[in-house]
Amino acid sequence: MKSGVCLCVVMAVLAAGALAQPVVPAEATDPVEQRAQEAPRRQLRAVLRTDGEPRARLGALLARYIQQVRKAPSGRMSVLKNLQSLDPSHRISDRDYMGWMDFGRRSAEDYEYPS
């Protein structure tokens, strides 16, 4: 999970660095073509001005990503639960069946020992 977060941080820093670099205007002879090329840049600048500080937006985005990662089911247990729910005749229900010795939940009085 830490590697995923680190990867997101690196990607966000690279994207912010690329957006912060000034763009060298191409030599366009047609004014209509030049306006068409500048329109996305103007929109991006307007969004950046209205959103506020880029670091605050990055922090909010990372916080939202971390919340989604924590809520998402992961690992082997989620796969096992899905497999058990598919077969209703499965004998093991909630990891408890006859003959299973769970030392943490049962006391010695529950069992009859031959003497």
UniProtKB/Swiss-Prot annotation:
It is found in: Secreted. Keywords: Amidation, Cleavage on pair of basic residues, Hormone, Secreted, Signal, Sulfation. Residues 1-20 form the signal peptide. The modification Sulfotyrosine is found at residues 97, 111, 113. It comes from the Eukaryota. One of its GO terms (biological process) is digestion. GO terms for cellular component: axon; extracellular region. The modification Phenylalanine amide is found at residue 103. The keyword rRNA processing does not apply. The precursor is cleaved by proteases to produce a number of active cholecystokinins. This peptide hormone induces gall bladder contraction and the release of pancreatic enzymes in the gut. Its function in the brain is not clear. Binding to CCK-A receptors stimulates amylase release from the pancreas, binding to CCK-B receptors stimulates gastric acid secretion. Belongs to the gastrin/cholecystokinin family. Binds to CCK-A receptors in the pancreas and CCK-B receptors in the brain. This is Cholecystokinin. It comes from Mus musculus. The gene is Cck.
